[in-house]
Amino acid sequence: MKHGFIKVAAAAPEIRVADPMFNADAVIRAMDEHARLGVKVLVFPELTLTGATCGDLFYQNTLLAGAAAALEKVVKASEGKDMLVFVGLPVAQGAKVYDAAAAVCNGELLGVVPASCPGDKHFALPGALLDDIQIGSLGPVDFHPQQLFQHSEVSELNVAVLVGADVSASVSPAVRHALAGATVLVEMAGFPMATDSACRMTTAVRAESAKLHAGVVLAAPGFGESSTDATYSGLCLIAEDGKVLESAEDGCSDVVTELDVQLLIAARRKDATFTGDAASYVVTEWGEGVEETVLTRPFGKYPYRPDDPADYHAAAKRLLHMQAASLVRRMQYANLKHPVVGISGGVDSTLAVIICAEAVKMMGLPADYVNAVTMPCFGTTDRTKSNAIIVSEQLGATVRVIDIGESVMQHFKDIGHDPENRNVVYENAQARERTQILMDVANGFADGGIHVGTEDMSEFADGWCTYNGDHISMYDVNAGSTKTMVQMVVRYVAETTDDQVLAKALLDVLDTPVSPELLPPTRNGEIAQKSEDSVGPYNLQDFFLYYLVDHGFAPEKVLRLADTAYGDEFDHATLKKWLRSYCRRLFSQQFKRSCLQDGPTLNGFSFSPRTGFLMPSDGSDALYLASVDALK
């Protein structure tokens, strides 16, 4: 459970209808198996100990007493297991029978939760408040539909349960539970199999977990339930904040994975609509200490891309449209006709010129209204210059080549800088000269021009840009896109265009090292200044951006996730080195982010100084660097 990872499971063992002791044995076997796996929350279907299809037998004292005895057996078998188990059974209270879930942990019955919305005529509504309940020799314990089971050591782990028809109720108790603080919603379902049941429930669980920023663990009845009028599939699902992590439907299903409750809390903190309280809830503690959870779930290397590469094209198409549409809106508002973009042959400027081409197309303007300006200087290579021109020409843009070498040398002379001194002045003078040219070219159009920026969010995060140089534009279409997102969109265009000349150039752009090209090339004419040698691989940078900045995880947890995702590429020491570098640059380069121009937010996170991630320009990095340095 360290770092907020909780191993959870949903199980639908084969049962016998109206045979509580047989079913208790099935539950106990599953408990033993999952305890060995380190599971901390185990969920069974509705009415596990009797079966959900007993009909009027639910009124029979014999079945009710048998279910109580079976629960006693399960509770006793849970001794020594630090695992919260939810098992279903019918319970009698006075003249009423209730569809209920028993919460069991380490030899104790912690509470009994009746269904808030019983969907079977045999079961009663629980009312607002019920007395404590005694089940056989167990209890008395709380008997209330509004209960939270809070871990004694992991404050973010609060579990609430939905029983039977609660799972699909039009006004679901899940909302109330989540607003009261439940981060894990246990759903003990009882629905039969239908042609669309798996699809329907998967969609519902995904949506519910996303809306409530919750983990959902669902188990539905499987083999052994009566087939008199229906078939039961044993559907089991585990979802987290809109993503289905595990699912199975094979009659006797069983799924296990880890939920990240820290991720859920991070999402809720940023959701201003997420307000509520637990005043009406009974809160019961469970659990003993914090253990290291062995991670079995995969963590992708590209968190800003879809999990499934098969979805890349659809995501890239949507991103491209969003970026182009945002530029169209700005140009229409300001009555501008000519987007002006500086092209370098790098991936960011390549995407920017593609976006500009798409924007003028959407506006019904000629393709040559796009002005692509390449400004070679001391570090420009033939490869990047050639690719920049080919891409722009194939898109139909007007290409201008303006060599800035002479201008920069004159500038050096004016300020008394020795051009042999290749320090930050040598580099930044080139970037600022380019920005001045692009601004002035845009201003030169009688019917309006706009300097379109190319800098992406990854470079704003690490500050790998020249202040008041490539850092500034009139509108930055890449401001909300990370480097790995930019690469995905450029690859999408390369793989879907019918223009093979364009495709070849785009693929070569993707294969070109990321570089500002501000230092002279090698003797062989190759790029000498490679960004990733200075600031680290952009795949890693985007990974750190997602978990450290976007989700607010501690460096220790971020490094653990990086080891999990990138252990096949980088050793632990290398990952730690680049994480430390990232933390340092995140703070030291904030002054550049504090004055960013407008640009679209594309994935819910940005560095906009108006609506995005905000921090002071002079904040201390000491705490973060000390946290990284303390890691082994």
Question: Predicted segment positions?
Answer:
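ATP/NTP-dependent adenylation/nucleotidyl-transfer catalytic domains that generate, transfer
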Residues: 6, 155, 213-214, 226, ...
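Enzyme catalytic cores with a strong preference for nitrogen-chemistry domains
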Residues: 1-340, 358-367, 399
